């Protein structure tokens, strides 16, 4: 089961007993389906939970004659599509008009009379998500969207979302394949919206996943930093060893000044040791910068005096 399906399952488990709240939820489901008119009501979904929720709401509120169909989404897939159809046209007309829409009305807008309180708005948005909402797996990305069939409805939905007082939401929009997408990519806003419409468990799951990602990223950054440092140490050490070997072959290490001679022998014995550790292991310990300064002098000696004395 996908994360989006889990969200819809949780939303469908919300207990609601007030008739107006049930009606607002049903309104959200029907209005944002692609077939809601005075002559035809058809609801298609991949979620069996959403399909059964719609049937429950219709039967409790209007008792229409309903047919539920089920079919495989594709021949090569195990996922199914569920279609709930209100059979009788008189039932369609009765339901359509009860939500304040006029018989034969083609262009639908959100009738705000059905969203007269915060509780009704919550129920309405719960229905909208069950109808056209989806959310990505938080392990992959943060993305929640509503795929809205009409431009006017997408604009109305954005307004409803933006006016929620319990959380601050800033929906974005884009047109995709003839549909109007209202979406969120900020994890905080997604969690707030899920909690608002009745899916706090999934909201907590997203927050937990985000925390795990942050820990992993911090660990990876630390590991990458350590690997990079090891690489730098190895490169610098190889350069120093080459210079010392060159001195050894030409004028001899014992010809070096005492401070350079000591660190040269220590480097030969400890090719993987960091500059900090080299400095601490000298007869008179010095800092990392002090050890680095001696190594730079050693490299300069190998590049200048060795060439002169080695002719």
Where are these regions (language model features)?
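N-terminal, positively charged regions that mediate nucleic acid binding
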Residues: 1-40, 44-58
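Flexible, glycine/charged-enriched surface loops at secondary-structure junctions
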Residues: 170-172, 275, 308-309
